[in-house]
């Protein structure tokens, strides 16, 4: 009957913001146009929060800016480097999904920030604090410049190959092709070079310019055209990954039917509906806002929130969620959350935040990129200069080889594949009702080989009922049930609720409880009419030195039946005994079997007695069960598994079992829908109470890890091959672009496969 709160791991345990001290903020609908930027940057996996100074000054304030051109780590790196040099800027927070930049600064105005961003070729629009974010305007580019570029590049190649016209004609056609398709790349490349940033735009601009200078006009045109096409396809693919989560938000209707003061019903925009308003929903309609049913009954498809395949019965007092579908009957509900603070909105916001946290593979890519790109650039310079100067080689041949090296100098495939794969995995999990709070958990789930589980509400339904009552003191026979009910009514533990509920029909006179105190892992204590009473488990009785062999025998008999026993005591001894039983969820048996098939061992940790723990564990097939545990005992059990070399996950309700959940590699919270605490604090929040979602998560984690490894291997092999054939003088520039961008698209599409899981 503990009432502990779920506090979480320190930030040092994982490379992301693990304190979760912030509250989830409202979310707005958003959509992305095909912003044609390549995401090649050494800092693609950087966290969204960048601290430029150790502490913020007393006068620091937060200014938010919408930057429509900022939807890729390429722009993030440029902005970070530029604003990092601006005196007074202390912290940057990038939201690439919504294209919003938060700047913590102590500048007198935001003009220097806006000017600095403008110098990078981007426009920063200041946003009012708390204002709703406007959706990014889809960027509509005319198709004819790209078509002209492609036709020009092809014609230049054909004329050059057949000698059908003079070289100056080829040069003119190629120049038209380059200018029509590559001006944007040149502009971005120049800005990057001015800021000493070797991103893909800078490298491609240098390579194309070099090809022009040595007279390779047709190849320069073809390289620029292929790069522009690949970049466009890549941007569309990235948008698909970004919009996978945002698409959920479109499930909420724009309007809902609201009861007016005169009793009439009027359609109103959901954003304008106030808390407490009475909303009507007919069969087949989507529910527009979170609320509580006040009239009617129906079945509701909750798949957008919980991933449940079967509709759920709803009646008066039940919660309903925005975005879910009313199926059979009419309902009226009272609004409990604003449109931008619904459970669905908070889920989407949490996943968007999770996209900024670095997974282990992203950290590897980050480190690799910082070394690889400058190294290949220096190698290209050496290749262009050393053989002609010191080995008598032909300048043209080796400059050309150096230009080919520049094309493969940016690890685009590596850089792009990791975030696309992680975002796709996060979206796939969210659609199944599994809220993963970062790539570090999505990728780390495949390592788990041991899962510790709480009992009540996790393996069992968490809705126990009182099955037995036994008076232990004839003098208190009349008063004991009422006293127990009064104490139990002050606790929110399921066992206490069962005792309190059983007393409702008996209509006891209400008793006032003074000096009430919850005793973690043992029970509760309170004063009634000046007398101190305890209501608790076997451990509490022993602590009070009020146990006896006769009482032990009674407890043992009930515990062997899988029942939890609670005793009412005063200073003289036990007054009454209450036995409570919970039922095992059928889904728990299936989940444990699936975990067994995945090679994951299971351990049940519960504050309930050992006999009940073993009985429940035997029913569902759990490998090992430990009972009579305090929260600190559960922590020690997790530590013991770590000491044996296991990677451990812990499943609880997101509120109790705080130390164990915090210590585990991944903390899973059950039934998080409608529970703010669980959504905010869990590493992985299951939106309903179906334990089968954990093996589903582990399978998804293994698939994600496999795809990440496939992508890294493919990208590195292609890079190695092209470095080899470049030195052999076989590779051409357009072949390098085709291969480099081709493998980038392959790994992106491979990552997007997770959206179909």
Name each model feature, range by range.
Residues 1-168, 244, 262-267, 274, ...:
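Flexible metal-binding regulatory segments at protein termini and peripheral loops
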Residues 87-105, 110, 247-341, 439-484, ...:
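Conserved cytosolic catalytic loops of P-type ATPases
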Residues 115-137, 143, 174-259, 274-282, ...:
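Actuator/coupling domain of P-type ATPases
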Residues 143-154, 363-392, 401, 405-411, ...:
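Bilayer-spanning, highly hydrophobic alpha-helical transmembrane segments
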Residues 158-166, 186-189, 194, 206, ...:
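Membrane-embedded alpha-helical bundles of multi-pass transporters
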Residues 159-160, 324, 449-492, 522-603, ...:
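ATP-driven catalytic headpiece of P-type ATPases
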Residues 201-205, 254, 305, 364, ...:
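Conserved catalytic phosphorylation-site environment of P-type ATPases
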Residues 530, 562-564, 570-710:
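Conserved ATP-binding TGD loop and adjacent catalytic N/P-domain core of P-type ATPases
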């Amino acid at each position: 009957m503990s009432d502990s709160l779920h506090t979480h791991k320190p930030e040092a345990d994982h490379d992301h913001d693990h304190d979760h001290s912030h509250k989830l903020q409202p979310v707005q609908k958003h959509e992305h146009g095909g912003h044609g930027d390549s995401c090649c940057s050494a800092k693609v996996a950087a966290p969204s929060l960048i601290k430029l100074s150790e502490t913020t000054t007393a006068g620091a304030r937060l200014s938010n800016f919408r930057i429509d051109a900022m939807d890729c780590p390429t722009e993030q790196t440029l902005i970070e480097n530029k604003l990092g040099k601006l005196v007074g800027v202390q912290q940057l927070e990038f939201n690439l999904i919504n294209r919003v930049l938060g700047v913590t600064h102590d500048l007198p105005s935001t003009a220097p920030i806006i000017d600095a961003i403008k110098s990078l070729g981007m426009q920063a629009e200041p946003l009012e604090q708390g204002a709703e974010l406007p959706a990014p305007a889809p960027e509509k580019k005319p198709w004819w410049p790209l078509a002209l570029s492609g036709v020009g590049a092809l014609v230049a190649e054909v004329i050059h190959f057949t000698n059908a016209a003079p070289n100056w004609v080829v040069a003119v056609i190629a120049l038209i092709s380059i200018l029509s398709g590559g001006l944007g790349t040149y502009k971005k490349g120049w800005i990057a070079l001015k800021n000493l940033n070797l991103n893909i735009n800078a490298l491609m601009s240098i390579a194309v310019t070099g090809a022009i200078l040595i007279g390779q006009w047709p190849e320069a045109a073809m390289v620029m055209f292929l790069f522009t096409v690949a970049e466009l396809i890549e941007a569309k693919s990235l948008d698909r990954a970004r919009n996978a989560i945002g698409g959920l938000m479109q499930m909420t209707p724009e309007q809902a039917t609201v009861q007016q003061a005169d009793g009439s019903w009027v359609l109103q925009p959901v954003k304008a509906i106030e808390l407490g308003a009475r909303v009507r929903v007919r069969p087949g309609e989507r529910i527009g806002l979170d609320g509580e049913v006040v009239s009617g009954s129906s079945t509701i498809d909750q798949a957008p929130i919980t991933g449940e395949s079967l509709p759920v019965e709803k009646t008066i007092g039940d919660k309903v969620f925005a975005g879910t579908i009313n199926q059979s009957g009419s309902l009226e509900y009272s609004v409990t959350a604003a449109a931008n603070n619904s459970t669905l909105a908070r889920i989407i916001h949490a996943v968007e935040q999770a996209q900024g946290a670095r997974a282990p593979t992203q950290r590897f890519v980050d480190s690799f990129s910082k070394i690889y790109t400058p190294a290949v650039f220096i190698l290209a310079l050496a290749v262009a200069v050393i053989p002609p100067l010191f080995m008598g080689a032909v300048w043209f041949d080796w400059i050309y080889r150096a230009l080919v090296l520049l094309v493969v100098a940016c690890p685009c495939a590596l850089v792009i594949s990791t975030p696309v794969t992680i975002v796709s995995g996060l979206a796939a999990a969210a659609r199944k009702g599994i809220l993963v709070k970062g790539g570090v958990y999505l990728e780390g789930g495949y390592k788990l080989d041991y899962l510790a589980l709480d009992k009540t509400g996790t393996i069992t339904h968490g809705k126990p009922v009182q099955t037995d009552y036994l008076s232990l003191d004839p003098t208190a026979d009349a008063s004991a049930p009422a006293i127990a009910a009064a104490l139990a009514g002050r606790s929110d533990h399921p066992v206490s609720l069962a005792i309190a509920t059983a007393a409702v029909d008996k209509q006891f006179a209400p008793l006032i409880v003074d000096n009430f105190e919850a005793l973690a892992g043992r029970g509760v204590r309170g004063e009634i009419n000046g007398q101190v009473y305890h209501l608790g488990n076997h451990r509490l009785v022993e602590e009070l030195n009020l146990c006896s062999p006769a009482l032990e025998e009674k407890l043992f008999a009930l515990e062997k039946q899988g029942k939890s026993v609670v005793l009412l005591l005063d200073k003289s001894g036990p007054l009454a005994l209450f036995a409570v039983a919970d039922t095992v969820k059928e889904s728990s048996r299936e989940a444990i079997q699936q975990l067994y098939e995945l090679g994951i061992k299971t351990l049940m940790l519960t504050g309930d007695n050992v006999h009940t723990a073993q009985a429940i564990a035997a029913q569902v097939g759990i490998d090992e069960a430990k009972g009579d545990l305090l929260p600190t005992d559960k922590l020690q059990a997790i530590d013991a598994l770590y000491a044996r070399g296991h990677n451990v996950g812990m499943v609880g309700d997101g509120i109790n079992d705080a130390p164990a959940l915090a210590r585990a590699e991944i903390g899973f919270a059950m039934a998080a829908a409608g529970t703010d605490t669980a959504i905010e604090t869990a590493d992985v929040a299951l939106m309903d109470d179906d334990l089968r979602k954990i093996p589903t998560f582990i399978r998804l984690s293994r698939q994600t890890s496999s795809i990440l490894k496939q992508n890294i291997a493919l990208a590195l092999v292609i890079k190695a091959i092209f470095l080899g054939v470049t030195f052999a003088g076989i590779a051409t520039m357009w072949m390098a672009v085709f291969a480099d961008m081709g493998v980038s698209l392959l790994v992106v599409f491979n990552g997007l496969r997770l959206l179909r899981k």
